Amino acid sequence: LHSFPTRRSSDLARLLLDGKVVGEMKPYDEKTGIIYWDIPFRVGELRAEGCDKEGNALSGYSIRTSGRPYAICATADRTILSGDRVTAHITVEVVDEEGTVVKLGDNEITCTVEGPARLLGLEGSDNSDMSDYTDNRHRVYHGRLLAYIQTTGGEGQVKVKFASPLLKGTEVKFEVRQ
């Protein structure tokens, strides 16, 4: 059995696996501050729902079982950068063949930048990681990392590429304008 805890968002909560109830409605535990269920592990989408007294869902949070790491997915907060020393943030994720983030992934990602920009750093948010954040290689933490890209004053297209052994790589393109 595995324990699946949830924090309080309402007085009652239930647990669903692929839309079917696997954890009956439970009240908030004043002593621990946590509602939890012990259930056998099964692959799928696990959803905790905070409910009112009538059983209507008021809030919820889902996680999905992932497969093996397959590819790198990158999403930028913007694709047009105006001016010198403007910073863009790129969220980099290791995903399975279905596009689900592999939370257990700790792959090392290499970043290269082409064009009028430079890599400021890579950050995985792992407090125990003492590696150089300004290096162009970094391990993902819980399947994710954040890349900081800064313009260098020129105009044109910027390509930011992400690669890792055995994973399908990706790239993000920016347009730099003055």
Where does each model-flagged region fall?
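Short aromatic-acidic-glycine turn motif
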Residues: 25, 69-73, 111-128
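Beta-strand-rich extracellular modules
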Residues: 51-53, 163-167
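Long hydrophobic segments that form regular secondary structure
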Residues: 10-59, 76, 95-98
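Short, small-residue-biased leader/transition segments that mark boundaries at the very start
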Residues: 2-9
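Edge beta-strands of extracellular beta-sandwich domains
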Residues: 55-67, 168-177
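Short, hydrophobic beta-strand segments
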Residues: 36-41, 134-153
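Exposed beta-strand face motif in extracellular beta-rich ectodomains
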Residues: 42-46, 88, 154-158
